[in-house]
Amino acid sequence: MDSDEGYNYEFDEDEECSEEDSGAEEEEDDDEDEPDDDNLDLGEVELVEPGLGVGGERDGLLCGETGGGGGSALGPGGGGGGGGGGGGPGHEQEEDYRYEVLTAEQILQHMVECIREVNEVIQNPATITRILLSHFNWDKEKLMERYFDGNLEKLFAECHVINPSKKSRTRQMNTRSSAQDMPCQICYLNYPNSYFTGLECGHKFCMQCWSEYLTTKIMEEGMGQTISCPAHGCDILVDDNTVMRLITDSKVKLKYQHLITNSFVECNRLLKWCPAPDCHHVVKVQYPDAKPVRCKCGRQFCFNCGENWHDPVKCKWLKKWIKKCDDDSETSNWIAANTKECPKCHVTIEKDGGCNHMVCRNQNCKAEFCWVCLGPWEPHGSAWYNCNRYNEDDAKAARDAQERSRAALQRYLFYCNRYMNHMQSLRFEHKLYAQVKQKMEEMQQHNMSWIEVQFLKKAVDVLCQCRATLMYTYVFAFYLKKNNQSIIFENNQADLENATEVLSGYLERDISQDSLQDIKQKVQDKYRYCESRRRVLLQHVHEGYEKDLWEYIED
């Protein structure tokens, strides 16, 4: 173990049972390296490591109690969606949605507390209880129900652990003499008995092989809670104390901790990992909902789906949109220009020669048709390069189907291009913070106070909020059926979009001494108007949700 002081989570002796409590006698063990299973050791390593994004304050922030001004969806310290703390976690102030941001070590503490609560009833070693809870997806009630149904042997077999009450008996049966060296069954090198270690199943291997085996499982295969004994055919799981004792690399230990805590978080509907790269913080809510939460790293996301906060579109439609973009966006332009659909099976076909006689390569179709009119090829006779069948009914039907497909593609491209345009603009606007900071410094040199120049930062905050909202309005509009309410929505969208572009233009202008007061007035008026129009748009969409005014196009 590292000599540096780390976080060692242990139960108090009076809260954890001994082996006598489990009905087994305390026995001397030849293996002096065997850990005390009554202590859950997941933390003899610093949880903060450069480049892994773990750390920060110990205490979680209850975001409903923080203050601060409004910020942008992407700006430093900003708060998207109409509120949020300037430098810390933010939230939609009109929504009383309270949450905590937890560090990795706090999640470990939550795990230990969960194990402690269960152990007050079932009285098992902490490492065994952790494996049992993992098997039941950390559902304490299900574990308790199974534990007391009268069939403990079946339960422990399903969880791939040895019944603690048989622990001493198993150790005694597998005690080996230390009088002579013995070969390791993995590397076949001879070592003294003191260099061997193993699990309660009785299979023992040299410590070097154990370390390499565990490192491979953790770092290359990403396994944490399901690492089994390396003996062939043995499915007994390796406990946490054994892993932490046999691994010396702190990076491997840190990865193992993350794998174990990840299973705890993924099984808890009130917990969600921050989706930001290299951030190991977790958001804990009082109840799960599609609401915005902000991590300590500054990332704001939807707690329900984990995507960036996407008001006004719902998670269901955003998920469909993202999938559609992943499938279509890179190839749609090429498909529109170079391919047609088979009039029979609608498989997309590329013409790779000059002849208009097409044969569908779909093994279940094999339709023959004309590339020009999409009608059956048989009536074309010998007109190999000139189609004179434009007026036939079947050819017209095929062309109509093709036109509908093209129209659907053009509609998708219309919304996709505008969605991507606002996304790109949002990235550019994010760079405005550096430019605005420089302008604010220049304005202070022209006899303006620090407070007087804050309108520029506020304007960029509002601009980024509006860009993010507009980006997701095009996802909402793509799936929206036309009706009177959708027309109102599109008018609100157009008004906000126009005002946002004007505000963006103001902020990109060079500010001179002569235009200082004029541009300040224009920027303030315009960002206030943008705030108002954004609020109106969102309120109208939310009212439509409440009154069931929206009808959708199933893609």
Curated annotation (Swiss-Prot):
It catalyses: [E2 ubiquitin-conjugating enzyme]-S-ubiquitinyl-L-cysteine + [acceptor protein]-L-lysine = [E2 ubiquitin-conjugating enzyme]-L-cysteine + [acceptor protein]-N(6)-ubiquitinyl-L-lysine. GO terms for cellular component: Cajal body; Cul2-RING ubiquitin ligase complex; Cul3-RING ubiquitin ligase complex; Cul4A-RING E3 ubiquitin ligase complex; cytoplasm; Lewy body; nuclear body; SCF ubiquitin ligase complex. Zn(2+) 6 binds at C370, C373, H380, C387. Pathway: Protein modification; protein ubiquitination. Pfam families: Ariadne, IBR, IBR_1, UBA_ARI1, zf-C3HC4. Autoinhibited by the ariadne domain, which masks the second RING-type zinc finger that contains the active site and inhibits the E3 activity. Inhibition is relieved upon binding to neddylated cullin-RING ubiquitin ligase complexes, which activate the E3 ligase activity of ARIH1. Zn(2+) 5 binds at C342, C345, C360, C365. Zn(2+) 2 binds at C201, H203, C229, C234. GO terms for biological process: protein ubiquitination; ubiquitin-dependent protein catabolic process. Residues 65-90 have a biased composition (Gly residues). Zn(2+) 4 binds at C302, C305, H310, C315. The active site is at C355. The modification N6-acetyllysine is found at K140. It is found in: Cytoplasm; Nucleus; Nucleus, Cajal body. Coiled coil: none annotated. It is an enzyme of class 2 (transferase). Zn(2+) 3 binds at C274, C279, C295, C297. Belongs to the RBR family. Ariadne subfamily. E3 ubiquitin-protein ligase, which catalyzes ubiquitination of target proteins together with ubiquitin-conjugating enzyme E2 UBE2L3. Acts as an atypical E3 ubiquitin-protein ligase by working together with cullin-RING ubiquitin ligase (CRL) complexes and initiating ubiquitination of CRL substrates: associates with CRL complexes and specifically mediates addition of the first ubiquitin on CRLs targets. The initial ubiquitin is then elongated by CDC34/UBE2R1 and UBE2R2. E3 ubiquitin-protein ligase activity is activated upon binding to neddylated cullin-RING ubiquitin ligase complexes. Interacts (via the first RING-type zinc finger) with UBE2L3. Associates with cullin-RING ubiquitin ligase (CRL) complexes containing CUL1, CUL2 and CUL3. Interacts with neddylated CUL1. Interacts with neddylated CUL2. Interacts with neddylated CUL3. Interacts with neddylated CUL4A. This is E3 ubiquitin-protein ligase ARIH1.
